[in-house]
Amino acid sequence: MSTPLDHIRNFSIVAHIDHGKSTLADRLIQLTGGLDTREMKDQVLDSMDIERERGITIKAQTVRLSYKAKNGEDYVLNLIDTPGHVDFAYEVSRSLAACEGSLLVVDASQGVEAQTLANVYQAIDNNHEIVVVLNKIDLPAAEPERVKQQIEEVIGIDASDAVEISAKTGLGIEDVLEAIVNKLPAPKEGDRNAPLKAMLVDSWYDSYLGVIVLVRVIDGVLKKGQTIRMMGTGAKYPVERTGVFTPKMVQVDDLGPGELGFITASIKEVADTRVGDTITEDRRPTENMLSGFKPAQPVVFCGLFPVDAADFEDLRGAMGKLRLNDASFSFEMETSAALGFGFRCGFLGLLHLEIIQERLEREFNLDLITTAPSVVYRLNMTDGTHKELHNPADMPDVVKIASIEEPWIKATIMTPDDYLGAIMKLCQERRGIQIDLTYVGPRAMITYDLPLNEVVFDFYDRLKSISKGYASFDYNLSDYREGDLVKMSILVNEEPVDALSMLVHRSAAEKRGRALCEKLKELIPQHMFKIPIQAAIGGRIVARETISALRKDVTAKCYGGDVTRKRKLLEKQKESKKRMRQFGKVEIPQEAFIQALKMGDD
């Protein structure tokens, strides 16, 4: 089964969201005969419905293509289709480490975007050869010459011999295959007889086969019947089957050096298979591990609660199943006075949060409420200890805290000139510090340091609406810095609502509090008594709105008669309302929570 090393090419496709990399992958599969016409469907590698609908790739996928080149030789091309979105950058990093080259796909009508940059720099860090592919050249707006110049200016790689294609119509696809064979390097030397050393690229759960592990063999041979050992965790498993994706699962006898394939080994949980771990044979282990990956750290936290408390156990089961497939998603139980039992969940970013929420609602038919997203704060206590704060409601007494540190990010924004002023204003409003501003033709590239707290709220939506969708945004975490942060509580009828408490910067507290109170005033229905809605910092009220009471006309049955009769009825009503306000409970509808947390829509 084994293919000579110089006839193997391992490559990934790197691009910004929507520049057509999944479509290009479809064409490559079609042209090399991976699937026949009947089995072909659009974005064949995006296996989740949500991936296909949103037109984004979430999990990295792999395919083995067999291609007979124009020089008459047979080649094996292993393609890894990577996600383009910033939240899934860790999926990109591990996919790139399994390859020697990359196709950089750039939309010929739009040019280089912020995430193109981030992913290309990752590819360059992995010493990849890069073949530039200009896609969508059939569009009337395509400007291949301008985009080539832009690639050379911004990224600094030679684009003079870029392959011009249209993945949609299939134009130029064969040139891409030839470029892969001729320009990308074969895998570095691997020894079939050396002890087994393989990198764990990805893993996911299959209800029939257990955990399927995607591996890239470096030295030695992986075959059925071996007992393998994960060097990071020390766990041992017998290999049950080895195979490749074409993109259908096809079993093969063994996987040799340089090859990409999958194994199953009756592994029960994805958490047991750490991405970036080294797999070796238990009987004859390799000496040195591969330089490992950092496991992905959750960045954004929020509470997920079932709308109906009876769904709690179903939600627990559903989250367990998603965790099987997505080790970067973490959750633990929490309770809230307003929302009952639920979970505190950690995500890689806002898109990750949205996708998990949508998958829970879709695949498991659950109705959920999410609380306001928050980031991980570091608390330096007066007694010299340090704590991590995931949920603003758990914040200890202010007297015990010496200082609070919050995470900051380095953000790169690319935008047409026309929107530059508005975007800079937005960044300044969000306490941003400008680091750099460069021009590339008619587009500007700005680098800002921003507090993550200000970005998780609604920054991305605002950026897109200010720039009419033209600006693109990419970020990575830089460090923790001390900030003047305060906890803001929301009181409804003088009762604190824990699900709405948040940490905000002192300068923005009043504005944010007022906006939230106004929003709740619209959303909470009137009761028989008046309801005050207040935003408080410590003991100080910074904003207040009042929902007026519903009034029943108690004097309607008095026709004429003495005024004292009317007054008596009105006084009696007033007394009842006072008592009602004292003992009455304000029911906050679920919609009010959901809307109040989408503060960015005003």
From Swiss-Prot:
PANTHER family: TRANSLATION FACTOR GUF1 HOMOLOG, CHLOROPLASTIC (PTHR43512:SF4), TRANSLATION FACTOR GUF1-RELATED (PTHR43512). SUPFAM superfamilies: EF-G C-terminal domain-like (SSF54980), P-loop containing nucleoside triphosphate hydrolases (SSF52540). It is an enzyme of class 3 (hydrolase). It holds the Pfam family LepA_C. This is Elongation factor 4. HAMAP family: LepA. GTP binds at residues 18-23, 135-138. One of its GO terms (molecular function) is ribosome binding. Belongs to the TRAFAC class translation factor GTPase superfamily. Classic translation factor GTPase family. LepA subfamily. It is a peripheral membrane protein. It catalyses: GTP + H2O = GDP + phosphate + H(+). Required for accurate and efficient protein synthesis under certain stress conditions. May act as a fidelity factor of the translation reaction, by catalyzing a one-codon backward translocation of tRNAs on improperly translocated ribosomes. Back-translocation proceeds from a post-translocation (POST) complex to a pre-translocation (PRE) complex, thus giving elongation factor G a second chance to translocate the tRNAs correctly. Binds to ribosomes in a GTP-dependent manner. Keywords: Cell inner membrane, Cell membrane, GTP-binding, Hydrolase, Membrane, Nucleotide-binding, Protein biosynthesis. It comes from Brucella melitensis biotype 2 (strain ATCC 23457). One of its GO terms (biological process) is positive regulation of translation. Its EC number is 3.6.5.n1. Residues 6-188 form the tr-type G domain. GO terms for cellular component: plasma membrane. It is found in: Cell inner membrane. It comes from the Bacteria.
